[in-house]
Amino acid sequence: MPVVTMKQLLEAGVHFGHRTRRWNPKMAPYIYTERKGIYIIDLQKTQQLLEEAYYFVREKASEGATILFVGTKKQAQGVIKAEAERCGAFYVNNRWLGGLLTNFKTIRSRIDKLIELEEMEQSGKLEELPKKEQSRIRRVLEKLRKNLGGLKEMRRLPDIIYIVDPRKEKIAVAEANKLGIPIVAIVDTNCDPDPIDYVIPGNDDAIRSIKLITSVIADAYLEGREGAPLTAEKEETESAEETSEEVTEDINLEELEEEEEV
């Protein structure tokens, strides 16, 4: 039985690509036809490739692998957060910070700062500070939560990255490629499929399409984790502790507050 039916794909509008004037010729093998100026994606290929991605993620998860969900476009933000939290994945749904993977040591220090400030807030220590300082810290805290809130438990680089719209998330794609981290992605007709290890041809603009495909990947990760051996979990914990000890660079509030938007 397929992990997703043709009926589900059709009802979610997964087959609708972009207008013919906005396309990448490398996506030609995944296009079925053109209708009223819009490319129609071959759902048989989508079904087959989604299944391949599903089994890849499930197998890796059963070995203790971690996965990072990435989708910062408006249509993807809510789905990415909900599905990542459901399956226990890390996620980025607001803005990809340059160097998140290639300079993870520095990013991890910012995550640690987020955790530190949240502990101050929860313990009541923040309320003991002068009002002006409280306001400044809360601004920093809100910014950190938006950008790094889905990464608090990520103590090392992820083993897999799942991306909605690799064209928009080109920096994430480049960083993952540089580090040899396999990418699973929804690839629309205007995207370049070459940098993607597991291409899922599909509509990356419709919420229903994004939700259907993302839920399949989340299911795969969840099912794999449930059967993951304890030894893999133990190794991950030990690796996390080693990575945590390596982080020495301190990021102060002023630097965080003044950080330029990408």
Curated annotation (Swiss-Prot):
Family of the protein in this entry: Belongs to the universal ribosomal protein uS2 family.
Entry GO CC: cytosolic small ribosomal subunit
A GO biological process held by the record: translation
The keyword NAD is assigned to this record: no
Protein source organism: Thermotoga maritima (strain ATCC 43589 / DSM 3109 / JCM 10099 / NBRC 100826 / MSB8)
Stretches with biased composition (Acidic residues): 235-262
Gene name per UniProt: rpsB
Record protein name field: Small ribosomal subunit protein uS2
UniProt keyword Ribonucleoprotein present: yes
Molecular function per GO: structural constituent of ribosome
Region (Disordered): 226-262
Entry keywords, A to Z: Ribonucleoprotein, Ribosomal protein
